[in-house]
Amino acid sequence: MSALLEATGLTRRYGHVTALDDVSVHLAAGERVAVVGESGSGKSTLARLLLALDTPDAGTVALDGRPVRPGSARSTRWFRRRVQTVPQDPGRSFNPRMRVGDAVAEPLACLRVHGDHSARVAELLVAVGLEPDAARRWPHEFSGGQRQRLAIARALAPRPDVLVADEPVSALDVVVRLQVVELLAQLSAAEGLALLVVSHDLGVVQHLCDRVLVLDAGRVVEQGPVGEVFGAPAHPVTARLLDAVPTLAAVVS
Ligand SMILES: Nc1ncnc2c1ncn2[C@@H]1O[C@H](COP(=O)(O)OP(=O)(O)OP(=O)(O)O)[C@@H](O)[C@H]1O
């Protein structure tokens, strides 16, 4: 499969700490990849670099072979139209003084996407399981799970090819978490959207992703299809992560 989003040899240091050390990742159209690892292994650093929100000390991130560097809104517009993100905390990701419809339409205006923005917002609200008239309401009128649906609608507004999300469901309770994971899976399948998801919840990974990449101390120590890696972990870190989730079967069943 040819790569849509491809990172090659990413290294990121913070002072004497090497957060990421020569990491390469590729994501094909429609593919769903998880990044897992213990706390401090470099997952969020990798997500930020893949979103061109941070500059690597070495390595490149490219979309369809075109390299991207963090920079002005104008210089990265082409990239942001196609690579979007969903925030970790839906509670904080909306301006309380902006109606939901305007918030969902915000990327369309910022990224100068042409067309009828109100119609697109109504379509998106329905796609994420909300009523079209939600557009007139305020963020505080929605539950955490509904706000995460709104955040997904906002991310999908410019019709991206890739969603990179760092712990997109960790702020939600278990039942709502599974509903939002289901929504992401369904949208990814329907729109051919590629997903790269950082998650400490291996149940979420198993439910949502095709392939998993295990990070340890900034390096990829294991990767492969989720079933194979979780079924027969080859690296002690993977085994430790799995051991820490005794209720995995219960979470995903
Ligand atoms: N802005 C920063 N300044 C200094 N050190 C940082 C910074 N961001 C990350 N680090 C360090 O880089 C390493 C990787 O951090 P990162 O947040 O990517 O890990 P993570 O796997 O996402 O962790 P967690 O699961 O706890 O969120 C850690 O040692 C962290 O302390």
Give short role names for the model-derived ranges:
Residues 51:
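Helix-to-loop junction immediately C-terminal to a conserved catalytic motif
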Residues 59-70:
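Conserved ABC transporter NBD signature motif
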Residues 68-84, 98, 102, 110, ...:
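ABC ATPase NBD coupling module
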Residues 116-133, 242-243:
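Conserved ABC ATPase "signature" region
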Residues 138-142, 146:
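Conserved ABC ATPase signature
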Residues 223-224:
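ABC ATPase "signature
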